[in-house]
Amino acid sequence: MSDKIKDKVDLLGMDRAELTEFFASIGEKPFRAAQVMKWIHQFGVSDFEEMTNISKSLREKLSKTALIRTPKIVSEQRSADGTIKWLLEVDNHNCVEAVFIPEKSRGTLCISSQVGCALECSFCSTGQQGFNRNLENWEIVAQMWVANKALGCKPKEERIISNVVFMGMGEPLLNVKHTFPTARILMDDNAYGLSKRRVTISTAGVVPAIDKIKESLDVSLAISLHAPNNALRDELVPINKKYPLEVLMPALHRYVEGGHSKKHVTVEYVMLDHVNDRLEHAQQLIELLGDLPCKVNLIPFNPFPNTDYKRSSNNAVHRFKDALMEAGVNCTVRRTRGDDIDAACGQLAGKVKDRTKRTLQTVNLDKLHG
């Protein structure tokens, strides 16, 4: 990036308050923030000259002081089932993936929050990639910007992207500095106007940040549980050694009890053959969840290169589901989507390693989530 560009303010990742402050700094009135925000996010404009209801003098001023940075689209892959995966280059070395999953009643965009992941979950392709860095505001919201533009989304028309889930590459709650402001942009009526219940942050269990969601965002929460006891979860989801179940579960109860709206937690549980899919595991899960308002989402494992795990049989999955349902636990089996383009759950980054600057490092989790 040239020094000339470095001196400019990047507007893509700014929320309305930040944009208002920026316009004040260049002698403009507060209403300009909402005006420009609509152009950027609702109309997909990245060139100030296209903002036709803004004076020529202001467009010239913006061109000298600001920019709207967008990522390079390295590839777009379309699955037979309609799923679309974008590989986006956010700098000269790093790529991230975003996935759009169309359904009859909604369209869900799955976005990434980090380049790689520090948590090293043993069944996840991204976890085997290693961790490089957190994504910045603009790099996260750019995934929505790209998808919105690629899908031809327009203001005042029926939403194509109705839901956004932070379930792509990385652990969102180890990057609250950037995921939280991005969530606010997604929910701003001058940007994408999503309701709080249509924005979901998924976590492997970063307990201090779960409490921050309740306090400052009030969006939906999904927990990547995957095991009903500490011994097995230590193996599958290593962050459990730092935040074991006896610490995690009370945090989930605090989440559903806080805020202004009735909440539940989505519990993600990947089904691994002869690892966590037996009826004894189902019974342990029933006891663990207790009276927590939740929905369990059973996820058939999606294989990736060099993994020893296998997908549970359909019979095992449905036995597990039936046991939960009989105990009164709301449970569904996720339909695998996009596996033919490596866009299914757990497959992201499986073929991105060569395009990503891999950094194997010991990560201080406390420092990372701030």
Swiss-Prot record:
<keyword id="KW-0489">Methyltransferase</keyword>
<feature type="active site" description="Proton acceptor">
    <location>
        <position position="97"/>
    </location>
</feature>
<feature type="binding site">
    <location>
        <position position="124"/>
    </location>
    <ligand>
        <name>[4Fe-4S] cluster</name>
    </ligand>
</feature>
<dbReference type="GO" id="GO:0051539">
    <property type="term" value="F:4 iron, 4 sulfur cluster binding"/>
</dbReference>
<feature type="domain" description="Radical SAM core">
    <location>
        <begin position="103"/>
        <end position="340"/>
    </location>
</feature>
<dbReference type="GO" id="GO:0070040">
    <property type="term" value="F:rRNA (adenine(2503)-C2-)-methyltransferase activity"/>
</dbReference>
<feature type="binding site">
    <location>
        <begin position="224"/>
        <end position="226"/>
    </location>
    <ligand>
        <name>S-adenosyl-L-methionine</name>
    </ligand>
</feature>
<keyword id="KW-0408">Iron</keyword>
<dbReference type="GO" id="GO:0030488">
    <property type="term" value="P:tRNA methylation"/>
</dbReference>
<dbReference type="GO" id="GO:0019843">
    <property type="term" value="F:rRNA binding"/>
</dbReference>
<keyword id="KW-0698">rRNA processing</keyword>
<dbReference type="GO" id="GO:0005737">
    <property type="term" value="C:cytoplasm"/>
</dbReference>
<dbReference type="Pfam" id="PF21016">
    <property type="entry name" value="RlmN_N"/>
</dbReference>
<keyword id="KW-0963">Cytoplasm</keyword>
<keyword id="KW-0411">Iron-sulfur</keyword>
<dbReference type="InterPro" id="IPR013785">
    <property type="entry name" value="Aldolase_TIM"/>
</dbReference>
<keyword id="KW-0479">Metal-binding</keyword>
<dbReference type="InterPro" id="IPR007197">
    <property type="entry name" value="rSAM"/>
</dbReference>
<keyword id="KW-1015">Disulfide bond</keyword>
<dbReference type="InterPro" id="IPR048641">
    <property type="entry name" value="RlmN_N"/>
</dbReference>
<feature type="binding site">
    <location>
        <position position="117"/>
    </location>
    <ligand>
        <name>[4Fe-4S] cluster</name>
    </ligand>
</feature>
<dbReference type="InterPro" id="IPR027492">
    <property type="entry name" value="RNA_MTrfase_RlmN"/>
</dbReference>
<keyword id="KW-0004">4Fe-4S</keyword>
<feature type="binding site">
    <location>
        <position position="202"/>
    </location>
    <ligand>
        <name>S-adenosyl-L-methionine</name>
    </ligand>
</feature>
<keyword id="KW-0949">S-adenosyl-L-methionine</keyword>
<dbReference type="InterPro" id="IPR040072">
    <property type="entry name" value="Methyltransferase_A"/>
</dbReference>
<protein>
    <recommendedName>
        <fullName>Dual-specificity RNA methyltransferase RlmN</fullName>
        <ecNumber>2.1.1.192</ecNumber>
    </recommendedName>
</protein>
<feature type="active site" description="S-methylcysteine intermediate">
    <location>
        <position position="345"/>
    </location>
</feature>
<comment type="function">
    <text>Specifically methylates position 2 of adenine 2503 in 23S rRNA and position 2 of adenine 37 in tRNAs. m2A2503 modification seems to play a crucial role in the proofreading step occurring at the peptidyl transferase center and thus would serve to optimize ribosomal fidelity.</text>
</comment>
<feature type="disulfide bond" description="(transient)">
    <location>
        <begin position="110"/>
        <end position="345"/>
    </location>
</feature>
<dbReference type="GO" id="GO:0046872">
    <property type="term" value="F:metal ion binding"/>
</dbReference>
<feature type="binding site">
    <location>
        <begin position="170"/>
        <end position="171"/>
    </location>
    <ligand>
        <name>S-adenosyl-L-methionine</name>
    </ligand>
</feature>
<feature type="binding site">
    <location>
        <position position="302"/>
    </location>
    <ligand>
        <name>S-adenosyl-L-methionine</name>
    </ligand>
</feature>
<keyword id="KW-0819">tRNA processing</keyword>
<dbReference type="GO" id="GO:0000049">
    <property type="term" value="F:tRNA binding"/>
</dbReference>
<dbReference type="GO" id="GO:0002935">
    <property type="term" value="F:tRNA (adenine(37)-C2)-methyltransferase activity"/>
</dbReference>
<feature type="binding site">
    <location>
        <position position="121"/>
    </location>
    <ligand>
        <name>[4Fe-4S] cluster</name>
    </ligand>
</feature>
<dbReference type="Pfam" id="PF04055">
    <property type="entry name" value="Radical_SAM"/>
</dbReference>
<keyword id="KW-0808">Transferase</keyword>
<comment type="similarity">
    <text>Belongs to the radical SAM superfamily. RlmN family.</text>
</comment>
<dbReference type="InterPro" id="IPR004383">
    <property type="entry name" value="rRNA_lsu_MTrfase_RlmN/Cfr"/>
</dbReference>
<dbReference type="GO" id="GO:0070475">
    <property type="term" value="P:rRNA base methylation"/>
</dbReference>
